[in-house]
């Protein structure tokens, strides 16, 4: 019953609930307990929601569909603040939740007693988290986690999730996911619990890859007209936000809504400057709000064919009669270069990977996905399970200071005060 209590900051701003679940048992190898411990504390009822001035019911002043728990000044309501402060540390409940998340099993009786009877439960709990992170079951859970995050898996579609899991399990720099230039299509042997490095054989020479950005299975899975599905996959999986990716000062372009991208209006193609698709259309929505960024990213993926193989020519089509092959001017006019963001050019996929690896939003996205995993939330995109930046910022700092070791972040979150209090 931690769904109404764990991190009210996140609940108040995103409406996300956290729940625990059950699974089969697993015997871990841990020391025997030596002293008796107290039983698990129980939770009372959640506090009464804020009411309006007349006291006749809960309010939803901001119209977001959730009862207000933050007053107009931006301060958490006293009732909810009190509830947050009333949480108690329960390493037994935390151990159960962590074991289910990290191994897919319940903790063994020995593990439960080890924490329950330990002179310093916090230390004992941390030791068991370390054991879980070294367990082969964690590797399998990590692969499943990245299958879900990447929206792909099974057979050749496992190479990208397996590479991400390898970086996590082996405690490597996680930015290699976007920058590694070789051995980016590893395999995993479940029986032996081993990763085997392997090259992605799709026409790109070894030493010229860019992590999963050149993965053939990814390119095959998200093949589409103008490579827009590939660009969308990159944006949503690694930046944790949909298009439009960038917001600038509103500009009147003669439509019902303003143009809001930071790019110049004519930085992308339309039928008025050489393109065959009118990305300058303003008759309904302002297409360029999304396409200002998207059109600078998508051409980088246009030379992968429908099987994910690299070609010397553009291999994606236009959604027009007879499906003609796209040309560069369908995305960008003469003089424009591909880019990750405004003022961040990326002339090739390796440059794109480097720009993404240095992006604070990409750093925060990786940490947010771990946070949602730990707290039992859904996908930040598919389930719109957003997390306020201030909630994950301490762990983003940990991620940076550890040279982008995502495993360090996993441990930090699973041992965090907010994870062990109920």
State the predicted function of each range.
Residues 1-20:
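Sec-dependent bacterial lipoprotein signal peptides
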Residues 18-84:
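Ser/Thr-rich, Pro/Gly/Ala-heavy low-complexity intrinsically disordered linkers and tails
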Residues 21, 42, 55, 98-99, ...:
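Residue-level detector of buried hydrophobic side-chain packing
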Residues 74-108, 112-118, 132:
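N-terminal module-boundary/linker segments of secreted carbohydrate-active enzymes
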Residues 77-87, 218-227, 269-275, 279-282, ...:
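Electron-transfer interface patches adjacent to heme c in soluble/periplasmic c-type cytochromes
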Residues 93, 98, 137-146, 358-361, ...:
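Long, charged, low-complexity terminal extensions
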Residues 109-114, 157-161, 245-250, 297-306, ...:
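Short, solvent-exposed loop/turn and secondary-structure capping segments
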Residues 124-297, 357, 385, 394-405, ...:
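Extended surface/linker regions that mediate inter-domain or inter-protein docking
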């Amino acid at each position: 019953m931690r769904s109404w209590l764990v991190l009210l900051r996140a609940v108040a701003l995103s409406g996300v609930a956290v729940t625990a679940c059950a699974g089969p048992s697993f015997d871990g190898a841990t020391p025997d307990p030596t002293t008796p411990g107290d039983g698990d504390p129980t939770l009372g009822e959640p506090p009464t929601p804020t009411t309006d001035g007349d006291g006749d019911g809960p309010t939803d002043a901001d119209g977001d569909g959730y009862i207000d728990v933050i007053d107009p000044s931006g301060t958490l309501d006293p009732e909810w603040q009190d509830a947050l402060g009333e949480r108690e540390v329960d390493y037994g409940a935390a151990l159960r939740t962590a074991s289910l998340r990290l191994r897919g099993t319940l903790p063994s009786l020995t593990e439960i007693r080890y924490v329950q009877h330990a002179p310093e439960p916090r230390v004992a709990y941390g030791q068991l988290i370390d054991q879980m992170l070294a367990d082969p079951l964690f590797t399998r859970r990590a692969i499943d986690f990245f299958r879900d995050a990447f929206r792909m898996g099974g057979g050749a579609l496992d190479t990208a999730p397996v590479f991400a899991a390898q970086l996590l399990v082996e405690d490597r720099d996680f930015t290699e996911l976007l920058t590694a230039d070789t051995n980016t299509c590893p395999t995993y042997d479940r029986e032996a619990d081993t990763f085997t490095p392997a090259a992605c054989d799709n026409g790109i020479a070894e030493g010229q890859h860019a992590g999963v950005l050149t993965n053939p299975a990814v390119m095959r899975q998200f093949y589409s007209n103008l490579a827009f599905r590939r660009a969308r996959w990159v944006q949503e999986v690694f930046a944790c936000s949909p298009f439009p990716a960038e917001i600038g000062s509103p500009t009147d372009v003669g439509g019902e809504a303003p143009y809001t991208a930071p790019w110049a209006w004519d930085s992308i193609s339309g039928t008025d400057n050489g393109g065959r698709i009118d990305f300058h259309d303003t008759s309904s929505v302002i297409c360029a709000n999304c396409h200002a960024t998207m059109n600078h990213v998508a051409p980088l993926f246009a030379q992968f064919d429908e099987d994910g193989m690299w070609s010397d020519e553009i291999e994606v089509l236009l959604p027009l009669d007879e499906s003609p092959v796209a040309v560069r001017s369908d995305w960008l006019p003469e003089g424009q270069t591909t880019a990750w963001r405004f003022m961040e050019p990326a002339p090739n996929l390796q440059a794109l990977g480097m720009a993404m690896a240095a992006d604070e939003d990409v750093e925060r996205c990786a940490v947010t996905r771990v946070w949602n995993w730990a707290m039992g939330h859904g996908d930040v995109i598919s389930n719109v399970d957003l997390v306020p930046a201030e909630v994950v910022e301490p762990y983003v700092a940990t991620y940076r200071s550890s040279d982008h070791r995502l495993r360090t972040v996993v441990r930090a979150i699973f041992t965090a005060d907010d994870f062990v209090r109920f």
